Swiss-Prot record:
Note from the entry: A stretch of 270 kb of the mitochondrial genome is duplicated within the centromere of chromosome 2 resulting in the duplication of the gene. The expression of this duplicated gene (At2g07715) is not demonstrated. In Arabidopsis the N-terminal part of this protein is encoded by a mitochondrially-encoded gene (this entry), while the C-terminal part is encoded nuclearly (At2g44065).
The protein's name in its UniProt record: Large ribosomal subunit protein uL2mz, N-terminal part
GO CC annotation: mitochondrial large ribosomal subunit; mitochondrion
Keyword list, A-Z: Mitochondrion, Ribonucleoprotein, Ribosomal protein
Gene name tied to this protein: RPL2-N
Length: 349
């Protein structure tokens, strides 16, 4: 019996362009080409790697191949599982804890003259106080012994602080909120005027008073690589991750990670100021109709996956077909359960 030439489903058809034997300039390069009825290509499901079972809806004619095609509605195992490659191949997150109790990096505290000293502190538990340093001791004072308490004398001004607290103490202190006091505090302690989280410039010039300036300090004339007074430096700070004074005024206790995340996050545009997009009456009606369908539930559509497969001469409408994935050991049990549920003969594809 010759199948009826019904119109193919639009979601499974695609058209190809025809040149009729002409090139881009319109000249005939291949003779006896062109004309004929328009042929639409059918998408055939040839790469199904899941064990599934379906019912043949109809047998259709395909003008592009000598065999017939069958429209199959899959009732079991039709949807292929999508593997989340990001979660599968993502490496496990590792939390790196500080193992040394010395400060090192691009902006090392050795450049700050006479106020921050690198000293090893007696750690009571491993990994707990490894990132603490002694602040306030002069550089010429010998380190304290491990038998005595490292923070015994309060008159010397030695305190236990974190590394990030040392770096941001000049910015997060209440003195930094006042403009006059902040300049005097930062200039006396030798902190940089602006800290940039990047590889350039490699050095910075601390702002020091004339009384404190000596041989162990850097001057603006010695450091020519930074050139903080240039226009390019201002644009680099504005465009990249320059730490501004306003960000420190907003948050009194701001960590190094928090400052980096605050600068990396892009400001969101104000959606209220943007003009609203005009919505046509047709779109409003469609939305209202969809809402009614969802509430009533009467107009439910069978959304089972439907595909085209190559049909054999024995395949007819209404028969059961089954796709077997023999690479998996569970295929045999799946086939036995399918035969028990449906005693009709199954066609494996």
């Amino acid at each position: 019996m010759r199948p009826g030439r019904a119109r193919a489903l639009r979601q499974f058809t695609l058209s190809t362009g025809k040149s009729a034997g002409r090139n881009s300039s319109g000249r005939i390069t291949v003779f006896h080409r062109g004309g004929g009825s328009k042929r639409l290509l059918r998408r055939i499901d040839l790469k199904r790697s899941t064990s599934s079972m379906g019912i043949v809806e109809s047998i259709e004619y395909d003008p592009n191949r000598s065999s017939q095609i069958a429209l199959v509605r899959w009732i079991k195992g039709g949807c292929q599982k999508k593997m989340n490659t990001i979660e599968k191949f993502a490496p496990p997150r590792k939390i790196l804890e500080p193992t040394t109790n010395t400060i090192s990096g691009l902006f090392s505290f050795s450049f700050l003259p006479g106020k921050v000293d690198k000293r090893k502190v007696a750690c009571f538990s491993p990994g707990l106080m490894a990132a603490y340093v002694v602040v306030g001791l002069p550089t010429g004072m010998p380190p304290l012994s491990s038998s005595k308490s490292a923070f015994a004398s309060k008159g010397a001004g030695s305190t236990k602080t974190l590394v990030k607290d040392v770096f941001f103490s000049a910015f997060s202190s209440p003195k930094a909120k006042r403009e006059t006091a902040s300049l005097a505090f930062a200039s006396s302690f030798g902190f940089p005027r602006i800290a940039v989280a990047g590889a350039k410039p490699a050095f910075f010039a601390p702002r020091m008073r004339q009384k404190v300036r000596g041989k162990s300090t850097f001057s603006l004339c010695e450091v020519q690589k930074g050139r903080t007074h240039s226009i390019l430096w201002a644009h680099r700070i504005k465009g990249k991750a320059g730490l501004s004074w306003q960000s420190f005024r907003r948050q009194d206790t701001l960590g190094l990670v928090g400052a980096a995340g605050h600068k990396k996050s892009k400001p969101k545009t104000d959606q209220g100021n943007l003009p609203a997009k005009p919505i046509g009456e047709r779109a409003k009606q469609l939305k209202a109709l969809r809402g009614l369908r969802a509430k009533d539930g009467a107009c439910k559509v069978d959304r089972a996956p439907v595909t085209y497969i190559i049909a054999s001469h024995q395949l007819e409408a209404g028969k059961m077909v089954m796709n077997c994935d023999w690479s998996k050991p569970s295929t045999s049990s799946f086939l036995q359960s399918a035969q028990n549920d449906h005693p009709k003969p199954l066609f494996t594809v």
